[in-house]
Amino acid sequence: MTLTSTVRRIPIDDNPTLPAQFVADLKKEYTGTVYYNRFILGQWMAANGVIYRLLADSLAAGDGRFFWPVDKPLHPWRVRIGVDFGGNGSKHAFVATAILPGYSGVVGLASQRIDPVAQDADFLADRLLEFCMAVFARWGEIQYIFCDSAEQTLINHIRARLRRCKLSWLADRVENSAKIRINDRIRLTCILMGGGRFWLLPEASTLRDALATALYSGKHPGVDERLDDGSTDIDTLDAYEYTIERDFKRLTNT
């Protein structure tokens, strides 16, 4: 006996129960991503190549779509800093992100990479304190610092150093990263970009480059997997994602 199966493709437009505006918003948010084929067209599509195609194409075209307008005042509601610790060929990464009022969007405010080779914990803490002071001087707000939860010794050292500086109050705002699924983090940023709710400032150049060059690995067919072989800047991506991952539901209205 031979068993056969048929996969039926069901586009989202074939579902009459969904509100038209909901469908329109979903199409906008998923444009340019693998999720458009999967969730809008009802087609299975392997995740390959550039992850954030909209941003990469925008930077190549020089249209400035993802940069906050220079003539528009920016008033962050919350400012958060993400920290990823380097090692084994990777680098320390700091990213400051603004959450806009009502979770209406996010802005990459500033980012920095630090080479950890031949450096100690004090060197890392010094650079992070300098970064935090610059962010606070510019925006007058730091709600939290979210750090890679795998490095508790470094986190405790950062807290101790913060208590001895001008930003001593910030020591009690150092938290562990939530580390939700990487694919959920990717989908969150895709939704923000597609929905016109993601921007960058020039000071976030390493974040810009990390996002624009992020790739799917393509090593395991049928598996969504981000390339992490040292050829792309995963450290900065992680640091950025730590700043927004806890608000996945708020930022996606789910």
Q: Residue ranges of each PLM-predicted region?
A:
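Hydrophobic/aromatic beta-strand patches that form the interior of the parallel beta-sheet core
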Residues: T6-R8, I81, F146
